[in-house]
């Protein structure tokens, strides 16, 4: 009896299935994202399936620490939680041209220099193109094997032949399995090829890196299950026209998340930035209104970032509120609190807020700096010079506690700032050494903070 082929419609954004075409996906509510897929019913293997594993009491499980591969790139080791775990699968996403292939080729050279075999599957480029990039990056190694292939079965054959320690897939959207009838890059292909690569990585203990393209919204293209399958998800951030890039770990089964690695772009590749705060503050104008410096904590890194605001009279009945690098919904909430609790009128003004350097901030500790930048620009008055600002703002206008306060103060001292404005309630528990090295101003409410304007 021939196997009956079924047709279903799958969302390219979230992977939701539907028996018929819909204009709007019922899962993620996106429009025109459903594509047709043909699937054969799965075989019923329950009659002959077996398992060699049995349930084990938790107290009887023998602990085995993960084997990690270290490179000379200390920032990369820190990003992955202390080195790359053998047999792990990591997904690196980013916009086209931002430097994903360049980075992984450099990391491959680090692994190769340590004596590890690397199989680099360059499906999007020819061997000569990848070789030219390697020459530009001054990379030369007999331990890196280039393989321009997109067929998963051929890739598996070369894995058996070469037995690599490291596998790089560039990119997952172009790899296809001949057992599926759908086109490369489709939801089914991305899901199944990633699942197969995960199985190979775990079975053969091959550390695998796969490159994924991102959608217009900045998320990795393909079904959401792609991020659930892998062990680590890294996002390449930053402006493709700027001379630095940022890599953020948003998922890591073997280490902390939200680690941030900042790299500078040079003719011979990407290099780690030793002093990120100095990089973001090097172009700051000393005497200007509407500007504050905030300390933020990204993983184990503490950075000082400039927040810039511009407030101008609006010629329209509906004023404009725009942000860059700051959550627009959070910003609207802060402006409402500012008007209600501090009596700062903004309903006739256009308000713009930008995080200098292209960094994206999601932590609430940036609230105080953002609000004071707006008030400073509105009144065209200066804030205290050489101070940093940190604190979360509640709906009642209170300045709430933030985490890692000692790290924020320490970074402010290192960068030469003479004072910090912070929640009043956190001053009491600070070490005495901080009180001797930096001026600390505590504020209880947003109204207290506004009074700091000269």
Curated annotation (Swiss-Prot):
Gene3D superfamilies: 3.30.230.10, P-loop containing nucleotide triphosphate hydrolases
Residues reported to bind ATP: 94-101
EC class of the enzyme, as a word: hydrolase
GO biological process, one term: recombinational repair
Positions annotated as zinc finger (C4-type): 11-28
Region of interest (Lon-protease-like), residue spans: 350-454
Domain notes: Has a putative N-terminal zinc-finger, a middle region with homology to RecA with ATPase motifs including the RadA KNRFG motif, while the C-terminus is homologous to Lon protease.
Family designation: Belongs to the RecA family. RadA subfamily.
Reported function: DNA-dependent ATPase involved in processing of recombination intermediates, plays a role in repairing DNA breaks. Stimulates the branch migration of RecA-mediated strand transfer reactions, allowing the 3' invading strand to extend heteroduplex DNA faster. Binds ssDNA in the presence of ADP but not other nucleotides, has ATPase activity that is stimulated by ssDNA and various branched DNA structures, but inhibited by SSB. Does not have RecA's homology-searching function.
Name of the protein in its database record: DNA repair protein RadA
Record gene name: radA
């Amino acid at each position: 009896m021939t196997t009956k082929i079924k047709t279903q419609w799958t969302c390219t954004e979230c992977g939701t299935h539907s028996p018929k075409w819909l204009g709007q996906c019922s899962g993620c509510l996106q429009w025109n994202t459903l594509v047709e897929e043909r699937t054969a019913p799965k075989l019923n293997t329950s009659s002959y399936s077996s398992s060699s594993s049995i349930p084990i009491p938790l107290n009887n499980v023998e602990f085995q620490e993960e084997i990690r591969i270290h490179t000379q790139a200390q920032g990369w080791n820190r990003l992955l939680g202390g080195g790359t775990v053998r047999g792990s699968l990591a997904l690196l996403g980013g916009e086209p041209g931002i430097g994903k292939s360049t980075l992984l080729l450099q990391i491959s050279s680090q692994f190769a220099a340590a004596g590890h075999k690397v199989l680099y599957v360059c499906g999007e480029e020819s061997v000569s193109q990848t070789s030219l990039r390697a020459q530009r990056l001054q990379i030369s190694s007999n331990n890196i094997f280039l393989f321009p292939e997109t067929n998963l079965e051929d890739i598996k054959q070369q894995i058996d032949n070469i037995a690599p320690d490291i596998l790089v897939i560039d990119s997952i959207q172009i790899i296809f399995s001949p057992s599926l009838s759908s086109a490369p890059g489709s939801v089914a292909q991305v899901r199944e090829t990633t699942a197969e690569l995960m199985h190979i990585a775990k079975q053969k203990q091959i550390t695998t890196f796969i490159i994924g393209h991102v959608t217009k919204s900045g998320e990795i293209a393909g079904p959401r299950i792609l991020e659930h399958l892998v062990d680590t998800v890294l996002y390449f951030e930053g402006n493709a026209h700027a001379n630095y890039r940022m890599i953020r770990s948003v998922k890591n089964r073997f280490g902390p998340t939200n680690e941030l690695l900042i790299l500078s772009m040079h003719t011979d590749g990407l290099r780690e930035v030793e002093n990120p705060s100095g990089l973001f503050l090097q172009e700051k104008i000393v005497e200007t209104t509407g500007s504050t410096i905030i300390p933020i904590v990204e993983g184990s890194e503490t950075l000082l970032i400039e927040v810039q605001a511009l407030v101008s009279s609006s010629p329209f009945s509906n004023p404009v509120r725009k942000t860059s690098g700051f959550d627009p919904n959070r910003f609207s909430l802060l402006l409402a609190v500012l008007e209600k609790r501090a009596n700062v009128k903004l309903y006739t003004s256009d308000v713009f807020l930008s995080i200098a350097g292209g960094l994206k901030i999601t932590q609430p500790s940036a609230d105080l700096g953002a609000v004071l930048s707006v008030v400073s620009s509105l009144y065209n008055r200066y804030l205290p010079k050489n101070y940093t600002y940190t604190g979360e703002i509640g709906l009642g206008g209170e300045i709430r506690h933030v985490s890692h306060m000692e790290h924020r103060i320490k970074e402010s001292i290192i960068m030469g700032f003479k004072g910090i404005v912070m929640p009043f309630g956190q001053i009491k528990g600070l070490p005495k050494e901080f009180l001797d090295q930096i001026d600390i101003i505590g504020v209880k409410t947003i109204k207290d903070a506004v009074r700091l304007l000269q």
